[in-house]
Amino acid sequence: MLCVLCECRKAMLKRPKTLQPICKPCFYNVFETEIHNTIVESNLFFPGERVAIGASGGKDSTVLAHVMKTLNERYNYGVDFVLLSIDEGIHGYRDDSLETVKRNKVQYDMDLEVVSYSELYGWSMDQIVAQIGNKNNCTYCGVFRRQALDRGSAKLGIAHIVTGHNADDMAETVLMNLLRGDTARLDRCTELVTGSDDSPVKRSKPLKYAYEKEIVLYAHYKKLDYFSTECTYSPEAFRGTARTLIKNLEAIRPSTIIDIIHSGEAFVLKKKKEKKGKGSVVVKAKVEEKPVPSGGCSVPLAFDSSLGLSNRCTKCGYLSHNAVCKACVLLEGLNAGRAKMQIEGDSADGAAKNIKTLEKLALSI
């Protein structure tokens, strides 16, 4: 059977997204072109921007790094990409995957920065799970990871991170929020670019519309070097329930993944229109043009350094709406469980060393 796109080469695979029989060169082309179109249509980058790639060593981040390097050279984005990895401290998983990232650093000729939970917080994920058990450990990891990425970006002087979240991840998040009745989060979870007042860093997802199966095929046919083991603690996550449901639906209807994403986007748009009110006129505020700082998705950062310390955590100096940021709140709970452990001579309490470490790394905004 011939490829339906070029009609000259033998079809080597059936594309998961469309079920079209295509050859490998055409598959590479459509896969990369769709990602390029996502980047261009959303104005994700600007020439001279320095952008961090969230690198875990897994298939998604490895394909992301490979494609970003390829497209950057092909279309002359003029972007300086660097790799940023987080070491959560999960033995047998993260230590091995970081070795893959180190090889990717050489393969793609990119700088690499690794930020460790143990250095930032005084806790590894293995220690956290040993303390709290298997439930809710993803909550701790999510909060700590987000702040670790911000601090790593600040160290690199970067305000824009691209992550390997794919279409399957997006659909799972939409479904999770619906199953939990958390429709308020649909707005954020369907956006290609996200940011918040609690973070100085913009995050974008160039692989938003790329199917996981196609990412795996791309990595396989391109013979990319990636780590394929799943996180030790992820089977306990609620996301697994949504993933199983979506995989079952996808087997019947391949377009299910994109359909769910578009449904989430449409739901958000409808909510926004209803909030505006019938007959109301929405006037966009005029934004004063200023030089865009390093990184930022071509959009000035949403925070203002003139806000001062009132918007910073009183313990570690991290941006926060509350007096104490989420990471420090979680750390206080963890350190309370260490009451019977020997207190280090130079620390007033079990949390002091961790807080001092975070204070030294307070973001300069």
Swiss-Prot record:
Task of the protein: Plays a central role in 2-thiolation of mcm(5)S(2)U at tRNA wobble positions of tRNA(Lys), tRNA(Glu) and tRNA(Gln). Directly binds tRNAs and probably acts by catalyzing adenylation of tRNAs, an intermediate required for 2-thiolation. It is unclear whether it acts as a sulfurtransferase that transfers sulfur from thiocarboxylated URM1 onto the uridine of tRNAs at wobble position. Prior mcm(5) tRNA modification by the elongator complex is required for 2-thiolation. May also be involved in protein urmylation.
EC number: 2.7.7.-
Pfam families on file: ATP_bind_3, zn-ribbon_14
Alphabetized InterPro entries for the sequence: CTU1-like_ATP-bd, CTU1_C, Ncs6/Tuc1/Ctu1, Rossmann-like_a/b/a_fold, TilS/TtcA_N, tRNA_thiolation_TtcA_Ctu1, UPF0021_CS
GO biological process terms, semicolon-separated: protein urmylation; tRNA thio-modification; tRNA wobble position uridine thiolation; tRNA wobble uridine modification
This protein's UniProt keywords: Cytoplasm, RNA-binding, Transferase, tRNA processing, tRNA-binding
Pathway: tRNA modification; 5-methoxycarbonylmethyl-2-thiouridine-tRNA biosynthesis
Gene: NCS6
CDD domains hit by this protein: CTU1-like
One Gene Ontology MF term: tRNA-uridine 2-sulfurtransferase activity
Subcellular location: Cytoplasm
Major localisation: cytoplasm
Protein name stated in the entry: Cytoplasmic tRNA 2-thiolation protein 1
Taxonomic lineage of the native organism: Eukaryota, Fungi, Dikarya, Ascomycota, Saccharomycotina
